[in-house]
Amino acid sequence: MWSTECQRTVDLTAEVLWETWIKVLSGDIELPKGDRYEPREPVGPGASITMTPEGQDSIEITVIRWEPPHVQADRVSYGGVELTFTHSFMPAQTQGKSVVTTRLDIDGPGADDVGPTIGPGIAEDFPQAIDSLVQAARVDM
């Protein structure tokens, strides 16, 4: 398995971040330079969503973890490996703040070889994506 993550502590509650993230997944909000999401059914456990990364072809992701308002994860098969994206919004020790984490796990045969090749390119926009989500949450409040 190969993994990477990006984490930020922000001055918003997990609930506010979760609500905004669900609007992104539902296609109600499109983040600048972010992935575009088009759900095929109501967003929740097992939901199938068409995700279109900016400038790339669409892929089908499936929601595999759903723990409102703290964790959502989705998975896609790609080139013989499984890519799992986990988005978490956890309360920080300081009241009113949260730790936002976006994590990528690449699993399956050959993941140790494929992960370092494709993973950094996939995850390079994680910092910008978190910043855009936080900005959208502030506007949405």
Show where each model-derived region lies.
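Short coil-to-beta transition motif at edge beta-strands of beta-rich domains
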Residues: 43-50
